[in-house]
From Swiss-Prot:
Catalyzes the initial step of the lipid cycle reactions in the biosynthesis of the cell wall peptidoglycan: transfers peptidoglycan precursor phospho-MurNAc-pentapeptide from UDP-MurNAc-pentapeptide onto the lipid carrier undecaprenyl phosphate, yielding undecaprenyl-pyrophosphoryl-MurNAc-pentapeptide, known as lipid I. Pathway: Cell wall biogenesis; peptidoglycan biosynthesis. GO terms for cellular component: plasma membrane. Signal peptide: none annotated. It is found in: Cell inner membrane. The chain crosses the membrane at residues 24-44, 66-86, 88-108, 129-149, 160-180, 192-212, 229-249, 256-276, 281-301, 330-350. This is Phospho-N-acetylmuramoyl-pentapeptide-transferase. PANTHER family: PHOSPHO-N-ACETYLMURAMOYL-PENTAPEPTIDE-TRANSFERASE, PHOSPHO-N-ACETYLMURAMOYL-PENTAPEPTIDE-TRANSFERASE HOMOLOG. Its EC number is 2.7.8.13. It comes from Helicobacter acinonychis (strain Sheeba). Its cofactor is Mg(2+). Its main location: membrane.
Length: 353
């Protein structure tokens, strides 16, 4: 809106620069989240929209009155900033907004059910998976219709591994959406544990998206060019800004939790960025913390079902370290460090190809 008005009608040249609009979107989303979150916290406390705490984590029982669904606020702030600063005629922007709103809605349904039932169960697994699957499939098909190429790239290699048939590509993209959204959801168990690794991952992906959308940079770095995808940089920076605003209230001890409303939206948008920038495989490194958390759950369940033994004291793995006596802050900061280092290595693949 603001972009179309100031550049399209008044020809204010500053708004033609993607980096300026992305920076502006960052600060709009950041300050809007800072402004709205206290009001949301007061409303959520009045409505008793609190996060049910598992009885298996006694050290977290002091958090039982902490409101949840804070993800609604930072997703809303991101959408507002994107509407103001991004080009709404760009299909990647529109699909990015659909991803954020759609995945956040599924998360909201799950959060609402948990609050109403005062249980961690939420929606049935079939219902939740079904909604996420349909949403992922719709977005993946739309990407295919848009003409996104189906080459599969590996980190540090300039040439693609192979070209996937359309049906295989769509199925693979659906898998990426489902994996990333659930992985971030599993990670969101300690104050700030999901938000900061999400910031690192989104920042890395936004750089890849910017390069992919810039003809000169993509040619120089031997990176696959994706026409029009650079505009997604604006939404990514806006989401990072809103996450910083959220972290202001989510740092330990948290005043609010993001809930599934936020974690599913983050995972879905991270997956979307990875897909359109051809970083599906590299996402394993960028989202290393999310991968580790998910694998710990898979291994724990698999071990118990096959051997009746647990590999970890508790899963996801951040609870394992808590059970071993690590302070919550120690677990959080160490996981942040791993995430930061993983993303620095991932960024090296831009130049080392």
């Amino acid at each position: 809106m603001l972009y179309s008005l100031l550049y399209g009608y008044f020809n204010i040249n500053l708004f033609q620069y993607l980096t300026f609009r992305a920076g502006l979107g960052f600060f709009i989303a950041f300050f809007l989240t800072l402004f709205l979150m206290p009001k949301f916290i007061l409303w959520a406390k009045a409505k008793k929209a609190n996060q049910p705490i598992s009885s298996f984590v006694p050290s977290h029982q002091n958090k039982k009155d902490t409101p949840t669904m804070g993800g609604i606020v930072f997703v809303f702030a991101t959408i507002i900033a994107s509407l103001l600063c991004a080009s709404l005629g760009n299909p990647y922007v529109l699909l990015g907004i659909i991803v954020l709103v759609g995945f956040s809605f599924v998360g909201f349904r799950d959060d609402y059910t948990k609050i109403n039932q005062q249980s961690n169960a939420g929606m049935s697994a079939k219902m939740k998976f079904g909604m996420l699957f349909v949403l992922s499939l719709v977005v993946s098909v739309l990407l295919s219709v848009k003409g996104l190429d189906t080459f599969l790239y590996a980190p540090f290699l300039k040439n693609p591994l192979f070209e996937m048939p359309t049906a295989l590509a769509v199925g693979f993209w659906v898998l990426v959406f489902l994996s990333a959204s659930n992985a971030v959801n599993l990670t969101d168990g300690l104050d700030g544990l999901a938000s900061v690794p999400s910031i690192f991952t989104l920042l890395s992906l936004s750089i890849f998206v910017y390069v992919a959308g810039n003809a000169e940079f993509s040619k120089y770095l031997l990176y696959p060019k994706v026409i029009d995808v650079g505009e997604l940089f604006v939404i990514s920076l806006a989401l990072i800004g809103s996450l910083f605003g959220f972290l202001w209230y989510n740092c330990n001890p948290a005043s609010v939790f993001m809930g599934d409303s936020g974690s599913l939206a983050l995972g879905g948008f991270i997956a979307y960025n990875a897909i359109v920038s051809h970083n599906e495989i590299l996402l394993v490194l960028m989202g290393s913390i999310f991968v580790i958390e998910t694998l710990s759950v898979i291994l724990q369940v698999g071990s118990y079902k096959t051997r009746k033994k647990r590999l970890f004291l508790m899963a996801p793995i951040h609870h394992h370290f808590e059970q071993k006596g690590w302070a919550e802050n120690k677990v959080i900061v160490r996981f942040w460090i791993i995430s930061m280092l993983s993303n620095l290595v991932a960024l090296l693949s831009l130049k080392v190809r």
